[in-house]
């Protein structure tokens, strides 16, 4: 079974799915050995591991793809990755999805921050207009070759514009077809 199909089955299951956040191939092997059914990795952990720096869009798409591909090569379970803002505009999002799929990921999340972005835990974040994010999500959904490749929409609007805006955005992102939502 493809890792994408397995991941979709895991998220559709009524059971809670625990995804350890791993940061490199060693932690991926440890997570796999511990019996986790799937794993995830974030931009902050990738930036810290590869550069020793915070997650402020300093890693390129190619660097993230190479990092995630190495992780996917050493585990037999699905891996869900951080797609940041899609590394730019709508055109960039399409390319990001295609490259993440080819690298072996089971899915990714895309966030609605401006590019270059700041880590979600940092102050000074800004979000793009919701309509622009809807266009990015449509591009991401259209770009995926495997219908089981999971696309999660993430918003940082709660910290920027308040909870109501975050909820409004989630409703829009769900309507356009995002598989998962993250506030």
Tell me what each language-model feature is.
Residues 2-183:
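Alpha/beta enzyme core
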């Amino acid at each position: 079974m493809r890792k994408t199909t397995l991941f979709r089955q895991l998220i559709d299951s009524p059971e809670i799915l625990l995804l350890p956040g791993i940061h490199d191939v060693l932690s991926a092997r440890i997570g796999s050995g511990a019996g986790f059914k799937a794993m995830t990795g974030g931009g902050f952990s990738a930036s810290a591991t590869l550069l020793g720096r915070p997650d402020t869009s300093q890693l390129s798409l190619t660097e993230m793809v190479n990092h995630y591909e190495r992780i996917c090569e050493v585990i037999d379970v699905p891996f869900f990755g951080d797609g940041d803002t899609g590394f730019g505009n709508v055109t960039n999002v399409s390319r990001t999805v295609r490259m993440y799929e080819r690298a072996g990921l089971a899915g990714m999340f895309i966030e609605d921050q401006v590019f270059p972005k700041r880590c979600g835990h940092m102050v000074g974040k800004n979000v793009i207009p919701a309509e622009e994010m809807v266009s990015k999500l449509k591009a991401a959904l259209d770009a995926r070759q495997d219908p089981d490749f999971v696309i999660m929409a993430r918003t940082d609007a709660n910290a920027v514009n308040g909870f109501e805006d975050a909820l409004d955005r989630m409703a829009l992102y769900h309507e356009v077809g995002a598989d998962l939502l993250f506030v």
